[in-house]
Design a protein with these regions (language model features):
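PAPS-dependent sulfotransferase catalytic core
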Residues: 1-73
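PAPS-dependent sulfotransferase catalytic domain
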Residues: 50, 69-170
Length: 170
């Protein structure tokens, strides 16, 4: 779902950068995720003692950690290098919804005005996909979906955002 949406945005003129994650089995047309952003998010989660599929809340004080400050610095540098001359750009990583407060700091440092696109898809479709790709249990998949959706909705309140139903996209 998010890969299809990101590709549509790309076809409409959103620059995704040159360092995109390679396609893989189960997503043969590509993930459309900036590899550098994915790597920085993975490093930050690791330093917080978490992984991409951890449904727990992030630590309340994570933004004040050295790991978060390092991530902000790395993201600002990466985005300046890749998108400085680009009028319209975007990045996608399903974990971004967990880090919106951190990304606000990145956008402030870049003097960028973010807009958010939240894709609404039936949770059981996502759980099925996670089970096929990662052998994730239904209960864990539902917890992860709920964590991502609640954090994305809450963190993007008051910001420029659009909510799009997956079925309407397809």
């Amino acid at each position: 779902g998010t890969s299809a949406l990101t590709r549509v945005l790309n076809l409409l003129g959103v620059d995704l950068g040159a360092s995109l994650m390679k396609a893989a089995a189960g997503n043969e047309t590509g993930f459309w995720e900036h590899q550098g952003v994915v790597d920085i998010h993975a490093t930050l989660l690791g330093k917080l003692g978490m992984t991409w599929d951890d449904p727990r809340r992030l630590p309340d004080d994570y933004l004040n950690s050295d790991a978060a400050r390092d991530a902000v610095t790395a993201l600002v540098t990466l985005l300046r290098d890749d998108f400085a001359a680009k009028p319209l750009w975007g990045v996608k990583d399903p974990r971004m919804c967990r880090f919106v407060p951190l990304w606000r700091e990145v956008f402030d440092a870049l003097n960028a005005r973010p807009g958010y696109v939240l894709l609404l898809r039936h949770p059981l479709e996502i759980v099925r996909s996670l089970h096929q790709r990662d052998h994730m249990t239904q209960s864990r998949g539902l917890l992860l979906w709920l964590r991502h959706m609640l954090e994305a909705e809450a963190a993007s309140r008051g910001a420029a955002r659009i909510l799009l139903r997956y079925d309407d996209l397809m």
